[in-house]
Each structure stands twice: as C-alpha cells, then as structure tokens.
Amino acid sequence: MIFFGSELFAGGHSSTLQDVKARGKLRCVVTTGLPGFAAPDANGVWRGFDWDFCRATAAAVFGDANAVDPITSTGKTRFTKLNAGEGDVLWRNTTITFSRDVSVKLRFLGVNYYDGQGFMVNKSLGVKSAKELDGASVCIQTGTTTELNLADFFSSNNMSYEAVTIETNDEARQNYEAGRCDIYTTDASGLASTRSSLPNPNDHMVLPEIISKEPLGPAVRQGDDAWADIITWVLNTTITAEELGVNSSNVDQMKNSNNPEIRRMLGTDGSQGAELGLSNDWAYQIIKQVGNYGEIFERNIGVNTPLGISRGLNALWTKGGLMYSPPFR
C-alpha cells in the first residue's frame, strides 16, 4: 500500500520525531518572554511552566531535558513559525479555539492550563469592576483571542474603549507602566506574570471579572499523528504521575511499585515506549528530570512564587479541579 503526503514512516513512527532525533535538539515554540511561563533568567537560562513542558518533551525524546532550543514568537507569528517547520511543537500559553483547530491546520493536544481573560488596573484609578471601564484605554496584544473577547465584552455592556495595540508582553508592560493605557487585558495568568514584574506590584490589582474561557494547550502541525501522540502523552504523564503520587524525588523507588499503572507508566512493564518510537523509560525521564504536573505548577507559578497563583481549575479532578488524564493501559 502506498501513502502519498504521509508524515509517517513504516511502523507508524513519526517523521517529526525522526527529524528531531537527527537534529539532536527539540525546537519549541514559546513566547518572547512571560515570567513564570517562559522567559530567560538573569543568566539567560530559560525557565517557566510552559518551558518545563518543552523540557519534558525533550526528556521523553532524548532522555535529556536540556536538549531543547526556544523558538520565540509573538501572538501573530506563533502559528506561522510552527506551520513553517521552524518549531516542532508549540507550548506557548495559547488558547484552543474552533478556528485555530480547523482553519489554522493545527492539532491541539489537551489542556495544560485552564485560564480566563481578566483586567489589570492601577489601584489609583479607584476602579473595582470591569463594568466601570467605559472610555478607558486598553493595552491589548494583537493576534490573540483577547482582542475579540474585549470587543464583545465592551459591546455587550454598552461601553467604549480605546485600543492600544502591542505585540509582546514586554511591550504591554512598558506601555502600561508608562501610563499609555489605563488597563492591561490578557489571560489572568499573564496578568499575574506581568504584575509580578512591575516595580510595585501591590499598586496594581486584577479586577474580579473573568470574561472568557481560555483553555491553553500544546499544538503541533496536522498530518503527523504519531508525533501528536507523543506530545499528548507527555502532558498525560505529568498529570497521571501527580494523581498516582509519583514525583521527581520518589520516582526511582516507584519503579518497584506494586501498582500496575505506575509500572506501565514508568516502563517497568509493557511496551508503551516502543509503541511511541521512544525508549521504554521515556515517562520516567520526564518525571525524574522535570517532575509531575503539581511540581511544574508550584515551582513556576504557584502560591509560593512571585506570581502567587493557586491551583483552582488546574487542580486534579480528585481535588476539585479539571486536570484529568486517560489511564496508562
């Protein structure tokens, strides 16, 4: 049987995977810089919640979480860079929508952060509600769902606004800090990140209204289902590990667990690695080098970080949240 235009090799393995392995590095499409999610630190080392999922992918493929390069992108360029082959996978605070899934020819592969759009203001404005923002100037990133949500919210509440369009989070922060806009609107997680980087974070507040659903997740190009499977199960590994109590500190002991699902996940039993075109300890490497979902969350954006975000909807389903993974079976 002959397949034309297929991105799969014989045996069902991914051509993207083969390209990544041949290159020796994963290329991960990320933001230009969003503290807590993906940004270089003072030494130029990339860190953050989304960046850790890039690292988890590299750990699964190479057994080395550091075998990854950032492909920085704005809201306008992220999909172009992915579809043009500049990046292998997108882990970049990106909302899953109908049009992006269907028209942009991407495959979204689960939700790694449940978010919603909010508004940040300087407390000196005396504003307590987003419904008090009539006539305000608003900093807003182009090429995002935020633009459309903002227009809908103001229209439905019979309010007007002046858009101050920007392309990157740094540009938004600079304009907001300089007073060129009264309000900054983006996903609530992004607001927490921006607020933490301001000189006096306590002078600013995020208003109570959340005006949209923003399920954020990874994406790959359409046409390589085997590569999509790998990214899907990288995310699922982190969630399942947290649910089963497996973390970076105890994963070595857990390889000897009597729990059949833990043994399958860690490669002690079964052949899941071979079925993905990976080594049988691929999930072990993710957990050992990067951690489970809870570790990734708390280390980068949790309540004890400058962002101070509580788990909320991103808690496990067993703890009142929405995080839920299919079983390793």
Language model segments and positions:
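Acidic, polar ligand-binding/catalytic clefts
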Residues: R55, A59, G63-E132, A188-S212, ...
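Extended ligand-binding regions for polar small-molecule ligands
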Residues: G11, D52-R55, A59-V61, K123-V127, ...
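Extracytoplasmic small-molecule ligand-binding "clamshell" domains
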Residues: H13-W91, D269, L276-D281, I286-Q289, ...
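Conserved C-terminal helix/tail region of periplasmic/extracytoplasmic solute-binding proteins
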Residues: R299-R329
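Short helix-initiation/N-cap motifs at beta->coil->alpha
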Residues: H13-S14, V68-T80, L125, A163-A178
